Amino acid sequence: MSAKSNKIGVVQLTILTMVNMMGSGIIMLPTKLAEIGTISIVSWLVTAVGSTALAYAFAQCGMFSKKSGGMGGYAEYSFGKAGNFMANYTYGVSLVIANTAIAISAVGYGSELFGTILSPLSIALWTIFTLWLATVLNFGGARITGNISSFTIWGVIIPVVGISIIGWKWFDGSMYVNSWNPHNVPTFEAIGVSISMTLWAFLGLESACANADAVENPEKNVPIAVLGGTLGAAVIYIVSTNVIAGIVPNLELANSTAPFGLAFAHMFDETVGKVIMGLMVMSCFGSLLGWQFTIAQVFKSSAEEGYFPAFFKKITSKDAPVVGMITITALQTLLSLMTISPSLNKQFNVLVDLAVVTNVIPYLLSMAALAVLLKAENVAPQKYKTTVFVAFIGSLYSIYALYAAGEQAMLYGSIVTFIGWTLYGFVSYKFDLKK
């Protein structure tokens, strides 16, 4: 009885799933979407359907998979150890890239907060400083940084949800309509350009079932919570980014490095805008703090499985994989310098497109393996058919996201993938030689 009383219900899990999905990915999106116009609402709708399908399929993976290693374990059902390696490798690389983009977001809001104009090199150097600061603070272990991250996430959620509710008072319908497609880009192309950015806001949906053990009747309630949480996050994302487009003129929004702060300044005054910018910087850094530790843990787990070099699994007395953290941040430093662009927004866009491409690869591997996973675990026929169909929708969306990311991101993403196959060749003897 006491064990049951400690379980959470479907409504609580739905809210928890939604909150976990809403991170710092949203804070730069109004700027990127303003470059395309308010036609990007169609991209949001496409991504909402695709992301919900992926999240539901991942919830089923988590419910029924008997293999460890997250997406790598799912992929192993169809693709063996090579698939496990590639899923974990591309996922790890995507997190390295994504965290660099999060650091750039923090720098963008920080520069607006303090009223400074940064050169391309200065942006890179401040990004590097932010990454190293987050890494060093993680040397003390996960508990402190976990507590900080769970608090600072509200620095994003409160303004985003707030503007979704009260922003309509300042919404100008004619401004929104005039911003529909300011550059007269063909409709299909305009929708495609925005897909990477809208999917960026949902990265992390693969962990939607992480709280399955804490819920009553998980087989029934987890899929409901995942669907509800993903759709709830989608509604807030769509409403918040679109209401801003009716508050701030399109050109001004497209050139901003702190769009939510700018919107609140338009709604109230500069002081309120600065407060929102401060909250966003705090939240961004808190998110970065948590994700820097998470990346090191992903690499550590892969090293323990024998996929990555052994030094990634070395830990200190405080259970912090410090050597791995330093190595990862060194790679991020190099990435920050390699992607220096004429503006902060351009550098952010390059990193987001590449992060999405590398993150979608383990999504595709997991979706493709789901049919075998469900058969191996003797899932009921009707549930099997429904889940495989939903996974197919998720796969179609993932392939479209790859196409929409553009030639440059696909080129670099392909190189990253081919490097992965090469690296697997050096460790495959541990798994593929017949004993």
Swiss-Prot record:
<dbReference type="InterPro" id="IPR050367">
    <property type="entry name" value="APC_superfamily"/>
</dbReference>
<keyword id="KW-0812">Transmembrane</keyword>
<dbReference type="GO" id="GO:0015496">
    <property type="term" value="F:putrescine:ornithine antiporter activity"/>
</dbReference>
<dbReference type="InterPro" id="IPR002293">
    <property type="entry name" value="AA/rel_permease1"/>
</dbReference>
<dbReference type="GO" id="GO:0015293">
    <property type="term" value="F:symporter activity"/>
</dbReference>
<dbReference type="Pfam" id="PF13520">
    <property type="entry name" value="AA_permease_2"/>
</dbReference>
<feature type="transmembrane region" description="Helical">
    <location>
        <begin position="185"/>
        <end position="205"/>
    </location>
</feature>
<feature type="transmembrane region" description="Helical">
    <location>
        <begin position="117"/>
        <end position="137"/>
    </location>
</feature>
<keyword id="KW-0029">Amino-acid transport</keyword>
<protein>
    <recommendedName>
        <fullName>Putrescine transporter PotE</fullName>
    </recommendedName>
</protein>
<keyword id="KW-0769">Symport</keyword>
<feature type="transmembrane region" description="Helical">
    <location>
        <begin position="409"/>
        <end position="429"/>
    </location>
</feature>
<keyword id="KW-0050">Antiport</keyword>
<keyword id="KW-0813">Transport</keyword>
<comment type="function">
    <text>Catalyzes both the uptake and excretion of putrescine. The uptake of putrescine is dependent on the membrane potential and the excretion involves putrescine-ornithine antiporter activity.</text>
</comment>
<comment type="similarity">
    <text>Belongs to the amino acid-polyamine-organocation (APC) superfamily. Basic amino acid/polyamine antiporter (APA) (TC 2.A.3.2) family.</text>
</comment>
<feature type="transmembrane region" description="Helical">
    <location>
        <begin position="8"/>
        <end position="28"/>
    </location>
</feature>
<feature type="transmembrane region" description="Helical">
    <location>
        <begin position="320"/>
        <end position="340"/>
    </location>
</feature>
<feature type="transmembrane region" description="Helical">
    <location>
        <begin position="275"/>
        <end position="295"/>
    </location>
</feature>
<dbReference type="GO" id="GO:0005886">
    <property type="term" value="C:plasma membrane"/>
</dbReference>
<keyword id="KW-0472">Membrane</keyword>
<feature type="transmembrane region" description="Helical">
    <location>
        <begin position="386"/>
        <end position="406"/>
    </location>
</feature>
<keyword id="KW-1003">Cell membrane</keyword>
<keyword id="KW-1133">Transmembrane helix</keyword>
<feature type="transmembrane region" description="Helical">
    <location>
        <begin position="95"/>
        <end position="115"/>
    </location>
</feature>
<feature type="transmembrane region" description="Helical">
    <location>
        <begin position="39"/>
        <end position="59"/>
    </location>
</feature>
<dbReference type="InterPro" id="IPR004754">
    <property type="entry name" value="Amino_acid_antiprt"/>
</dbReference>
<feature type="transmembrane region" description="Helical">
    <location>
        <begin position="148"/>
        <end position="168"/>
    </location>
</feature>
<dbReference type="InterPro" id="IPR027566">
    <property type="entry name" value="Symport/antiport_PotE"/>
</dbReference>
<feature type="transmembrane region" description="Helical">
    <location>
        <begin position="224"/>
        <end position="244"/>
    </location>
</feature>
<feature type="transmembrane region" description="Helical">
    <location>
        <begin position="354"/>
        <end position="374"/>
    </location>
</feature>
<keyword id="KW-0997">Cell inner membrane</keyword>
